């Protein structure tokens, strides 16, 4: 499945696209791909890490940071629950979801691949993606 990293800003923010993030204070959830991307693109000094998404959004609402970079689906919920926030139209990054298995563990790999094949063939995988991820299964 595909995921999208989006940017949440306050209404009236001067941030209109990812191009405007240079020099800004960017909130991220610690250890996420948004954290990795933003730290790599803008440096640790511009990235403020939070233990979870709601804490990052609260910091944005309180004016402690300029924006939040986070997965699209939770971002929609955070914006719906906090008036005065919006998601920018331009995504920060697109990414693929994946399952990691220790190299050489063919027994587990075969079981996971078999289960995914079954779930794909009977439509269960697409139903899960549609309900919880809201993206196209790949």
Task: Give short role names for the model-derived ranges.
Residues 9-26:
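Flexible hinge/capping segments at coil-to-helix
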Residues 19-22, 40-41, 54-69, 73, ...:
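Short helices/loops that flank or line small-molecule/ion binding pockets
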Residues 34-51, 79-80, 134:
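Ligand-binding cleft/hinge of the Venus flytrap
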């Amino acid at each position: 499945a595909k995921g999208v990293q989006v940017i949440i800003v306050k209404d009236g923010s001067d941030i209109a696209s990812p191009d405007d993030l240079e020099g800004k204070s960017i909130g991220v959830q610690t250890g996420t791909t948004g954290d990795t991307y933003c730290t790599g693109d803008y440096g640790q000094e511009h990235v403020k890490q939070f233990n979870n998404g709601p804490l990052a959004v609260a910091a944005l609402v309180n004016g402690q940071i300029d924006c939040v970079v986070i997965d699209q689906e939770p971002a929609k919920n955070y914006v719906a629950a906090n008036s005065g926030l919006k998601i920018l139209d331009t995504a920060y990054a697109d990414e693929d979801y994946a399952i990691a298995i220790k190299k050489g563990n063919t027994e587990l790999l075969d079981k996971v691949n078999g289960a995914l094949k079954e779930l794909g063939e009977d439509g269960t995988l697409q139903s899960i993606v549609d309900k919880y991820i809201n993206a196209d299964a790949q």
